[in-house]
Design a protein with these regions (language model features):
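A short, N-terminal "cap"/entry segment at the start of jelly-roll beta-barrel domains
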Residues: 1-33, 40-42
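Short histidine-centered beta-strand/loop micro-motifs
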Residues: 21, 38-45, 62, 86-87
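Short, surface-exposed secondary-structure edge patches
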Residues: 41, 50, 65-68
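Short, conserved beta-strand element in jelly-roll/cupin
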Residues: 44-60
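A cytosolic small-molecule/anion-sensing beta-strand core signal
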Residues: 54-55, 71, 89
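Short acidic-glycine-tyrosine-enriched beta hairpin
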Residues: 64-79
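Ligand-binding loop in jelly-roll beta-barrel domains
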Residues: 79-97
């Protein structure tokens, strides 16, 4: 699931991302920069992940479906789901889950 930050209204300087029952205890947190020569290659694993785009634009592929993402977008990745991220320029993002 991809939640477009641009579609969420800001109230009192906050945006509420509705993630439903996708709540997880966080045991992984990493800030990454992806570039054309340093793509985030396809992988899958048994843990749910959340990606939050800080700066730049990229293409996220989840189970073969490609979606353009940019600043303030939140990507929810279910366990055992193929996922990757590529950027034509660069993108700074956080991975946690």
């Amino acid at each position: 699931m991809i939640i477009k930050g641009s579609a969420i209204p800001e109230v009192n300087f906050r945006k509420g991302y509705e993630i439903g029952d996708a709540q997880e205890q966080i045991d992984h947190f990493a800030m990454r920069i992806t570039t054309p020569v340093n793509p985030f290659e396809p992988e899958k694993h048994g843990e749910q992940r959340f990606w939050y785009i800080l700066e730049g634009e990229a293409t996220v592929t989840i189970d073969g479906e490609c979606t353009a993402v940019g600043p303030s977008d939140l990507i929810l990745i279910a366990p055992w789901t193929d996922h990757s991220l590529r950027a034509d320029n660069w993108v700074r993002w956080i991975c946690f889950g």
